[in-house]
Each structure stands twice: as structure tokens, then as C-alpha cells.
């Protein structure tokens, strides 16, 4: 296993920022547990204590006694943000933040994408205003040892914002630390190309194929790993002092009991950032899973979140509970849509983005066999015949690249896993549909449109086929 980065010191995290204790005072002197019990058990409104009559409300005191005497950092911050804490009986007790807790509460409330981060040195891109606000929001959270969910719509540039974040932190931290990006296989190559394009001086390491070594890891390096490899390398990855761990397409960790979620939770870091266009697809528990990874403890345990938030909101539609949840999560989740007033004016009319995907094993085998056979025939021909054979070969290779089933005319054959291009298309379209986007897919071949329609149907994506047979 690789050693931790030399000189690496963790930043201050949520657990050490705040240590909440509460006390009940009488003439400025704290009451002990025996005196508090006496006040809570009082049958009348007056209690003889310390040589004097003390007026009390037994019900209020009983509720106070149900509140834990000490709250850890996440629970205390949640109480400060929401303005209340829930006791063991489910009743709420008002909380008024003061001192540093109030300062932190106000500061977090100001993080919601208001400040713009200057483009860092080494970034070969011009960030749009909303992207600079996103970088500033992530950087402020990371500097405080916190984490968050960047939930921008697909196409708003979450990747370049993370690259800029890495550069900002590398130049603002007393000691630089590497960044780990965990992502689906289909976008691993895209991450590498985007980093090379927008931050050419940043060293990049892909933990794929046979070369998965972490030896000689640089403090300013970005490491890319798929979710599958991350699961297998979790112990080694946990040995590194990561500055930031980023989970791209973070819906992959929405099930806290799944192996992938357990593995990524075992990798410590100064800060964690989740990237997703759909923070909640079906249930509020998905939001809990994301924020419990980025900011552990903020929303309590899974059972606490279910009883205090999910059930009241999803089953009973309690507005006050929904508002309280919004207060808790707002500083830690930045959600921007393409139609937002602060985003739409900054967007170009169209952005062209190429996604390069690998061929499947079947496609590679068919490519090799077809090229070998065709070249033998082409070399033995000449003139117009030779030209025609070259064009037929190119057409066949295009069909194989689309899907082997198209070339073999297997209209009803299996689809999944046979074509890198089809699998990537389904993933991109699925992400867009989950973000309530509309998608137009073109193909030169009617037969390929039929295969796409079948594959979308398997994924539950409704579509209209506008292909007209020639």
C-alpha cells in the first residue's frame, strides 16, 4: 500500500469545528442533574432550591431533559441551521445559535453560489459566471473541511468546475494534496481528456487495466478510478491522504448498504464532493445517502432521517418539516438548472462535446477479422472495383462500431454490453432524462434506430422513433 502523502495534515472538519453543550443556569450558576430532575418532576410551578423559591415549567424542563446534554459537530450544526432540535419523544425544542455557532450558521448561509472565484492559474479555460460561483462554493466548503453536492443540470460543466477546484485548492492550501475522482467506466476517458485540455500541467493517473499503482503519487495529482476498481482497491486508496474525493454520477452511491457505497465511505479525505444531476430520483433517502457521505452526521442516522423527515414529508406532506430540511441542506447542495435566471444568460446557443468510448471485445474481434479479410480482397483488385470495396469496408466498420447486431442484422438479438457506443449513449440519455431534459438522437441507419428504441425500452426510457424506412 502507498504511504500517505508526506507532510499531509487534515484540514479542520465538521467534527472539530463545533462541540455543543447546553446548561440550565440559576443566577448564572449551572444546575446539576439532581436539581434538573427536581425541576422536571415538580408538581407545582415553584420549587425551593438553593435557599429560594424558583419558578419553573415542569413540562418545559421535562422536554429539556430529553435533549442530549452534548451534541457532536454535525448534530449541533444541524440544530443551529434549523433553529431547533428534536428530543427523544419527537418533540421540538427551539435552538438559538450564538457566538461561533451563529457566525458559522450565517457564513454557511452565504455560501449558496453568491461569490465568484477568480480563475486559478493553470486553468486553460474561461469559466462562465455561474461556474465561478460553483467553484467558489465548493472551495469554501472544502477549506472548512466540509463537503457538498453539486447538482447542476447535465451540460453545465461540472467537470471543468471540479478541475478548477483542484487548482484553487492546490494553490491556497498550506500543503497540497491529491484529488481522487471516482466515476463510471464510460466517462473515465473523458475525465482524462478534459483535464489534459483544461489543466495541461496537472499530472493525471488512471487506475485502469493492469497498471493500478499508487507509487510516487504527487501532491498535486488527480487520480481517476472507476467505481468497480475503487471497490477492489478501497484498502489501498484509504492509505492516501486525499485532499478531495469526488464521486461523479453519484447516484451510484445512493444505496448506503451496497458494496460501492461502503467502499467509498471507507476512503478518508479532507472533503468530499458528489456530482449528480438528479440528487433525488425516487425517495428522500437518496438525498440522505449523498449528504451523509459528503457531510457525515448532518442529517443524523438513516432511521432518524426516516422518522423526522422522510415520513412526515413523503407520507403526510408536512410543509414545516420540508422547510426545516431545506434549511439544513441548502448550504451543502448547489442545484442549478439551464433555465435559471443566473445561468441561462451565460449559456451559448449550443455546445459541442465529443465523448470517446472504447470498443467492446466483440467489436474489436469483428473489426480485426473483417479488416484482414477485406484487405486481402482489396489488394487483389483494382480500379472502380477496388474503390467500391474500400467504401463497403468503411460502411461495415461503421455498422460494427454502432453495434454488432446492426452489422449481423440481429434485430432481436441481445444488446447490452456488446457495444461501447450504445452503452454510452444509453447512459448519457438516461442521465439527461433523469434531469428532465429532452434528447434528440440521430443515426444514419434506420436499423440502428430500431436497436436504440429497444435498448431505451429495456431501461424504461420512453421515446418516439422518427426513423422512416428508405
Question: Where in this protein do the model-derived segments appear?
Answer:
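Charged, low-complexity
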Residues: 2-148, 202, 217-222, 227-228, ...
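Conserved SF1/SF2 helicase motif Ia
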Residues: 145-149, 153-156, 161-192, 270
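Conserved RecA-like ASCE P-loop NTPase motor core of nucleic-acid helicases/translocases
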Residues: 177-184, 195, 355, 438-445
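Conserved helix-turn-beta segment of the N-terminal RecA-like "Helicase ATP-binding" lobe
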Residues: 186-210
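Inter-lobe coupling linker of SF2 helicases/translocases
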Residues: 224-225, 229, 235-239, 298-406, ...
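SF2 helicase catalytic motif II
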Residues: 238-275
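Conserved interdomain hinge at the start of the Helicase C-terminal
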Residues: 362-380, 417-441
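Conserved helicase motor "Helicase C" RecA-like lobe of SF1/SF2 P-loop NTPases
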Residues: 443-467
